[in-house]
């Protein structure tokens, strides 16, 4: 009889243990970020998300091993937080908002500035990369964009702009037809 009373207690303890010992989904999200080339945009910068999906399609056609995906943040604050802490390697913003991010002004005034390197322009949009984004990856990404340029409305090399900008070194190498850098 005593064993019959212990069974419900054991089940309750086992249930509590399973709840607290279960794996967090965050580990899977980190693995997802490592397996896919994520291009972040934000709801607050309306044209960025639809264009990021087009960009992802072109990248995946030209460079399938990148397994590129569009990612969308809800707010500019979230964008700045994820990008400035190296959680997202690439960011697509309108030129106005990209300048604001780099200077910590405008919509990013209360969040602060973030350092970034230019990969490519698409009309009023700019693709930015983390300064720590490997030169080899920037070279591969730029090369994929160049090969898929006909499918990317308004794609413009950063070398064609008249303003002085901070272009990613790997992008410069690809645009100058230099060989792919080592990792």
Briefly describe each language-model feature range.
Residues 25-39, 171-183:
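Immediate post-signal peptide segment of exported/extracytoplasmic ligand-binding proteins
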Residues 33-48, 68-71:
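Short, well-ordered beta-strand elements
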Residues 41, 119-137:
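A bilobed periplasmic-binding-protein/Venus flytrap-type ligand-binding module shared by bacterial periplasmic
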Residues 48-64:
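Short, polar/charged alpha-helical segment
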Residues 53, 76-91:
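Short helices/loops that flank or line small-molecule/ion binding pockets
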Residues 64-81, 162:
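Short helix-initiation/N-cap motifs at beta->coil->alpha
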Residues 88-110:
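A ligand-binding cleft/hinge motif common to bilobed small-molecule-binding domains
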Residues 151-183:
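An extracytoplasmic/periplasmic, membrane-proximal ligand-sensing/linker region
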């Amino acid at each position: 009889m005593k064993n019959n009373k212990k069974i419900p207690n054991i089940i309750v303890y086992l249930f509590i243990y399973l709840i607290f010992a279960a794996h967090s989904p965050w580990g899977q999200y980190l693995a997802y970020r490592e397996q896919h080339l994520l291009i972040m945009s934000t709801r607050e910068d309306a044209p960025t998300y639809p264009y990021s999906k087009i960009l992802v399609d072109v990248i995946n056609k030209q460079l399938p091993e990148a397994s590129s995906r569009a990612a969308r943040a809800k707010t500019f604050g979230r964008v700045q937080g994820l990008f400035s802490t190296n959680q997202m390697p690439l960011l697509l913003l309108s030129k106005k908002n990209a300048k604001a991010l780099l200077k910590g002004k405008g919509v990013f005034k209360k969040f602060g500035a973030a350092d970034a390197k230019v990969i490519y322009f698409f009309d009023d949009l700019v693709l930015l990369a983390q300064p720590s984004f490997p030169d080899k990856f920037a070279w591969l990404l730029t090369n994929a964009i160049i090969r898929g340029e006909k499918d990317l409305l308004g794609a413009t090399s950063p070398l064609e702009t008249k303003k002085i900008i901070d272009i990613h070194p790997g992008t410069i190498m690809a645009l100058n037809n230099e060989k792919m850098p080592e990792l």
